[in-house]
Swiss-Prot record:
Cross-referenced Gene3D superfamilies: 3.40.50.880, Phosphoribosylformylglycinamidine synthase, linker domain, PurM-like C-terminal domain, PurM-like, N-terminal domain
Annotated ranges, domain Glutamine amidotransferase type-1: 1044-1297
Protein localization: Cytoplasm
Source organism of the structure: Vibrio vulnificus (strain YJ016)
EC number(s) on file: 6.3.5.3
Name assigned to this protein: Phosphoribosylformylglycinamidine synthase
Gene: purL
Length: 1297
């Protein structure tokens, strides 16, 4: 083993945070320094040249000064016996660089802890707990001890459970020791069947059975027979959900049987490379819509980052594994937790009810979990466009007196939509003899028993079992697998995939039997053919672990060669682990121990284990009405704006890429001031169309504490009032996902669940014409623990989260909440679907005063709700609405405030028509919406509303002005008069506090201060050219298409939109993978232009873009090709984002690039996804010809974009050379260091450079993601199809005239 030092691992503010944690624990720690340590496992000693190469490879990140660390050494490494995602990617790079003696690289962090007095062993243990994650890491006292990382354990054997002599008792004991969560009747079933087989079951067979038949996988409660209050019920819960499909099957192509549901989409030109020529072009066909929403609650409670991350990853795999291959497109993430209690910012309603030690508190879940979910989506390359966040934790009246209701077991929801070809919607037959394949990463000893663990209330299983059941993520591996799936579906009728499933709960022990069972086959499997990174695992651990980023597929023998070639090109590992058999029998052979760990008929595993019967009793609680004592209106406004459910969510949004794909038409951030208040998410179906897809969410979970049915109806209703803001047409085009969370078995909750499912499945959805073709349930939403001898529990309310998906006719018609001050005289109209009832039960107002109230909002009239949707659709289509915002949490007050924030304007409202009770009028959460309309169209709008049955509930409630005043009157009385800016700042406090705790606090403070500036003019545009002129048109007309190499490396994810931009400018865009160059399948000589695209090459493990660059620099043949290309004078090159970082590291090969800087971690130390204003500088770049002085917004999405120069002289030399091409500017047009206008902290606001001759340009922002006007989060009126950044690509074409 060789040890190589790396760069410092912690910035100053990260060190300060650790010191603060030490102080809180009364530790005498005075200083902490940390640096990365690299460990190389070698097959032979390295010669001097190879050692130098390895040292260069492991030099990445910010440049460091020499430093000799002092203090107690604590070395944190991945857990011995595991291989971290960092290791597998870094080892890949080393081998691609020709370092064949490097068997494996691994990285640890060496912490040096200084203290005023010697630390005791107890104190050292506390420090260890602060600096490492016990789930995935170990701590050593010296560097040499890291050799344990490379030790190889001997395989452990399987064990048997002796039921032949020990009977049922033996199985009962195994049920506890293995954490199987088997029900009594399942134990009987297994004893009976193995006795019939005349043999004892192996541990692996029992674990496989437990996973496959867990509540998590089998949905026993949803399939159960029910008796309520002594009356047998005619339908199961699942049957009532299916009723929505039976009554409205319209537009549904696949429901209830696959990994995601499918509905009809639009006919568009899908843009992808031809499988033979690899040239990108449009393929005119149906792009049907995939939809799926998952929950990952249990893992997120135990370990939030990996829990949320693998939640998003699993849902992405569900979409890819639909039919015989789908394409994930846009994501959503949502969280419900108990109260945050932010230190120093605790709110009056946030009582501390305690929690068990093994789960994480709500604050830490929300500091870590969202980062995990965002990081997976970012690295995979899926924009995250939607979400919600609710906190609830309160002592409420119950049938037993009082009980605490809340979300100690959080809800972590991950969902999304994608597209699929018409001919791929249904799975094919699995031929006998088909290869059964595991595609993706290796098996590791993690995530054991996740399905069974998720099926228990938090706190019921032993702590080490809880920790065993969380997984870890490697999104770059999943991206490679998806690229394989993409290549397969792009072959059309020649798609080699016959059948595909993702690997989720239960690992391959669930996925492989499910694969062959669904294909009506059996399977013969070889355990030792499963790719395995931990040789010491027992057969049970190899078969049942939940290592992520894996799919199982069936491929016919004659298609294996084509499949193998695709996997090799994409560098996606796979293994044939079995063969499909005619006989429906499952056999697993173990060549190492020469035995057969599994040998059982399929019907014992997946046959008909006993069906559950639920007996339930209805319990209704009389909750007292809200008392108004002590509620003062101004204070109520402030409290509600600070409630996390209502408050600004920027800290959850800017961490997630919202522009990747170049198809995003509506993200969360709205208007020139980029305020996060969008009603729904919208994507374009392709680059040649305005058809698209939309998704929205609805949930009103606290209402279930008063009325189960109302809570469910409101969730459906809110998803509709959110999605009504875009152009859908017929309501039957909308399909819903229903995610049900319940503390099953808790008194009254089972009957409540039945009531809620019936309310939507049998009543509301059929009445509206809505279908629920997909969903999921999580039935153990309760946390129990013992505190000082006292039994405690926190029980979640019944929680239905609805996600609505729809085909969109014209994405340009989507309306946002941004109030418009540039449209003449206008009015605000409230459509109140509560019809003046103004019920306050379970509202934000009740919550912030620690109350629940008695009567909640409800959907009293389904016909009126449908009339509302139809009216809004007519108005959206006729362009009659200037702004639209649904009414939800916080009521009318919050709706108006958010509209004013987005429009940066004043509101003057009068609520006299809404009744005398001001609090109830402003804070009720009845469904509805506020729209802004031009006064000269007001009558026409009101008559459309009246024609749809809404006349009595539509009220003109006021107007707007270009001031900072937020005024609400009731008749002549002013009831509220506030500064809009002051309200905006209160609304932002929660996001500021969370950002300051999680990211660089200096950056969080700057962003918060900027929100106080009422004079901020917002984003604006000033162009030196005519945006709607196509200067490439004359060259395109001649028919010659210069060849453009669209270059990608494993983990790159922005290549398709880049190809689309160059294609539109008249280039022949060709898909080139680095593996094509390294294997000689592609040569750069043939191309005029080269673009290195954005993403996360190798998951950014050796510095962003640095691993990719070094695989060129250290490979003689690749180096020669690139050098020759850059030196050819008739070529040009572009590097964007990851490609910018990569080309900056190739500067020794690029003439005139010698002054280029490096790009390192953002000053905020966070991935930044922003829509930032930049100015094009005067330079010789061929891309920016005629654009100097132009100022316009652009997509920014990166974690390592800060320019790093050697010193002041280097910076001065760059400025003097005339090679600065693009700078960040503030909204007044001045280059800025202020965050977030300068999102990465680059000196002199530099974010793009060129070479001295202008042939090679690099930039961190993404012009290719906003080349269409519709893909800009905000654009001025008057831009046509092409956005301002299309000019760059047209310039490149003109340059080759």
């Amino acid at each position: 083993m060789r040890i190589l030092r790396g760069s410092p691992a912690l910035s100053e503010f990260r060190v300060n945070k650790l010191l603060e944690l030490c102080r809180e624990q009364d530790l005498p720690v005075t200083g902490i320094y940390a640096e990365f340590m690299h460990f190389a496992d070698l097959t032979s000693e390295l010669d001097a040249e190879a050692l130098e190469k390895l040292e260069k490879l492991l030099t990445y990140g910010p440049t460091i000064e020499e430093h000799e660390p002092q203090g107690l050494l604590l070395l944190v490494t991945p857990r011995p016996g595991t291989i971290s995602p960092w290791s597998s990617k870094a080892t890949d790079i080393a081998q691609n660089c020709g370092l064949n003696a490097v068997k494996r690289l691994e990285r640890g962090t060496a912490y040096y802890v200084e203290s005023s007095s010697e630390l005791s062993s107890v104190q050292i243990d506390i420090v260890k707990s602060i600096i490492h994650d016990r789930m995935m890491e170990a701590v050593f006292g010296d560097l040499e001890a890291a050799a344990a990382l490379f030790s190889v354990a001997q395989p452990a054997p399987m064990t048997q459970v002796d039921i032949l002599s020990g009977g049922r008792l033996a199985l009962e004991e195994a049920n506890v020791s293995l954490g199987l969560a088997l029900a009594e009747d399942e134990i009987d079933y297994l004893v009976e069947n193995f006795t019939k087989l005349g043999r004892n079951p192996n541990d692996i067979e029992l674990m496989m059975f437990a996973q496959a038949n867990s509540e998590h996988c089998r949905h026993k409660i949803f399939n159960a027979d029910w008796t309520i209050d002594g009356v047998e019920q005619p339908k199961s819960l699942f049957k009532m959900i299916k009723n929505t499909f039976e009554t409205t099957p319209d537009h549904v192509l696949s429901a209830y049987k696959d990994n995601a549901a499918v509905m009809t989409g639009s006919k568009v030109g899908r843009f992808f490379p031809d499988p033979e020529t690899r040239q990108y072009n449009y393929h005119h066909e149906d792009a049907h819509i995939l939809m799926k929403v998952e929950t990952h609650n249990h893992p997120t409670a135990i370990s939030p980052w990996p829990g949320a991350s693998t939640g998003s990853g699993g849902e992405i795999r569900d979409e890819g594994a639909t039919g015989i291959g789908g394409k994930p497109k846009a994501g959503l993430v949502g969280f419900t937790t108990s109260n945050l209690r932010i230190p120093g910012f605790e709110q009056p309603w946030e009582t501390d009810f305690g929690k068990p030690g093994r789960i994480v508190n709500a604050l830490d879940i929300m500091l870590e979990g969202p980062l995990g979910g965002a990081a997976f989506n970012n690295e995979f390359g899926r924009p995250n466009l939607l979400g919600y966040f609710r906190t609830y934790e309160e002592k409420v009246t119950s049938h037993a007196g009082e009980e605490v209701r809340g979300y100690h077991k959080p809800i972590m929801i991950a969902g999304g939509m994608g597209n699929i070809r018409d001919e791929h919607v249904q799975k094919k037959e699995i031929p006998v003899g088909a290869s059964l394949i595991v595609l993706g990463g290796p098996a590791m000893n993690i995530g054991l028993g996740g399905g069974a663990a998720s099926s228990m209330a938090s706190g019921q299983s032993a702590e080490d079992l809880d920790f065993a059941s969380v997984q870890r993520e490697n999104p770059e591996m999943e991206r490679r697998c998806q690229e394989v799936i993409d290549r397969c579906w792009q072959l059309g009728d020649n798609n080699p995939i016959a059948f595909i499933h993702d690997v989720g709960a239960g690992g391959i022990s669930n996925a492989l039997p499910e694969l062959v069972n669904d294909g009506e086959r059996g399977g013969k499997f070889q355990l030792r053919d499963v790719p395995n990174d931990e040789p010491g695992m027992s057969p049970l651990e190899i078969w049942c672990n939940e290592s992520q980023e894996r799919y199982v597929l069936a491929v016919a023998p004659e298609n294996m060669a084509a499949f193998d070639a695709i996997c090799k090109r994409e560098r996606a590992p796979y293994a044939v682990v079995g063969v499909a058999t005619e006989e429906r029998h499952l056999t697993l052979e173990d060549a190492h121990f020469d035995n057969t760990p599994i040998d059982m008929p399929m019907d014992i595993l997946l046959g008909k284990p006993p069906k559950m019967h639920r007996e339930a009793t209805t319990l209704k609680v009389d909750s007292p009405a809200m008392t108004r004592d002590g509620i003062e209106l101004n204070e109520a406004v402030d409290r509600v704006l600070r409630l996390p459910t209502v408050a600004e969510k920027t800290f959850l949004i800017t961490i997630g890429d919202r522009t990747v794909t170049g198809l995003v038409a509506r993200d969360q951030m709205v208007g020139p001031w980029q305020v996060p208040v969008a009603n729904c998410a919208v994507t374009a179906a392709s680059y040649d169309t305005y058809h698209g897809e939309a998704m929205s969410m609805g949930e009103r979970t606290p209402v279930a504490l008063l009325d189960f049915g109302a809570s469910a109806r409101l969730a459906v209703g809110e998803s509709l009032t959110n999605i009504a803001a875009t152009d859908i047409g017929d309501i039957k085009r909308i399909k819903l996902s229903a995610n049900w969370m319940s503390p099953a078995g808790h008194p009254g909750e089972d009957a409540g669940l039945y009531e809620a499912v019936k309310a939507v499945g049998e009543e509301l959805c059929p009445a509206l014409g809505l279908t629920i073709p997909v969903g999921k349930d999580s039935m153990s939403m309760k946390t129990k623990w013992n505190e000082n001898g006292e039994e405690k529990e926190v029980t979640s309310p019944l929680s239905l989260i609805i996600t609505a998906f729809a085909r969109v006719e014209d994405v340009r018609k989507t309306i946002t909440p941004q109030l418009r001050t540039d449209k003449g005289e206008t009015s605000l109209v409230l459509v109140d679907l509560g019809n003046g009832k103004n019920r306050l039960g379970a509202t934000a107002l009740a919550q912030v005063y620690k109350q629940l109230g008695d009567k909640p909002a409800d959907v009293d009239n389904a016909e009126q709700l449908k009339g509302f949707f139809d009216a809004m659709q007519a108005l959206v289509r006729q362009d009659k609405l200037l702004a639209y915002h649904d009414k939800g949490d916080g009521g009318l007050l919050v709706t108006l405030a958010e509209m004013a924030f987005a429009g940066h304007c004043g509101v003057n409202a009068n609520i006299a028509a809404l009744g005398d009770d001001v609090l109830a009028a402003l804070f009720n959460e009845e469904l509805g919406a506020v729209v802004q309309v031009k006064n000269d169209e007001l009558d026409s709008v009101l008559s459309t509303l009246a024609a749809n049955g809404l006349e009595a509930c539509s009220h003109v409630i006021g107007a707007i002005d270009a001031s900072d005043n937020f005024v609400i009157r009731s008749g002549d009385v002013v009831v509220l008069e506030r500064s809009r800016t002051d309200l905006r700042v209160i609304w932002a406090e929660t996001t500021h506090k969370m950002q300051a705790l999680r990211d660089n606090p200096a950056c969080a403070d700057q962003e918060f201060e900027a929100k106080k500036d009422n004079s901020d003019p917002g984003l604006n545009v000033s162009l030196s050219y005519e945006v709607n002129e196509d200067i490439a048109a004359p060259y395109i007309a001649k028919g010659a298409k210069p060849k453009m190499a669209i270059l990608r490396e494993q983990g790159v994810n922005s290549h398709v939109e880049m190809a689309a931009a160059f294609d539109r400018a008249g280039f022949e865009a060709t898909d080139i993978h680095m593996s094509d160059i390294l294997t000689g399948q592609a040569v750069l000589d043939e191309y005029h232009g080269l673009v290195a695209c954005g993403g996360f090459s190798y998951g950014d493990v050796l510095g962003a873009g640095e691993g990719w660059a070094k695989s060129v620099l250290f490979n003689a043949q690749a180096r020669e090709q690139f050098q020759a290309f850059f030196n050819r004078e008739n070529t040009f090159s572009l590097g964007v984002c990851n490609g910018c970082q990569m080309l900056s590291n190739l500067k020794e090969l690029i003439p005139g690039a010698d002054l280029w800087p490096r790009f390192v971690r953002n000053e905020s130390e966070r991935f930044e996804a922003r829509f930032s204003l930049v100015e094009v500088q005067k330079s010789d770049s061929v891309f920016f010809d005629g654009m100097a002085g132009s100022r316009m917004p652009i997509a920014v999405s990166h974690g390592e974009g800060r320019v790093e120069v050697r010193d002041a002289q280097h910076l001065a030399a760059i400025e003097a050379s005339g090679t600065v091409a693009v700078r960040f500017v503030d909204n007044l047009g001045n280059p800025t260091q202020q965050y977030p206008n300068n999102p990465n902290g680059s000196p002199n606001a530099i974010t793009g450079l060129t070479t001295k001759d202008g042939r090679v340009t690099i930039m961190m922002p993404h012009p290719e993601r906003v080349f269409r006007t519709v893909a800009n989060s905000w654009a001025p009126e008057g831009w046509g199809e092409n956005g301002a950044w299309m000019r760059m690509f047209q310039n490149a074409r003109k340059n080759l005239a």
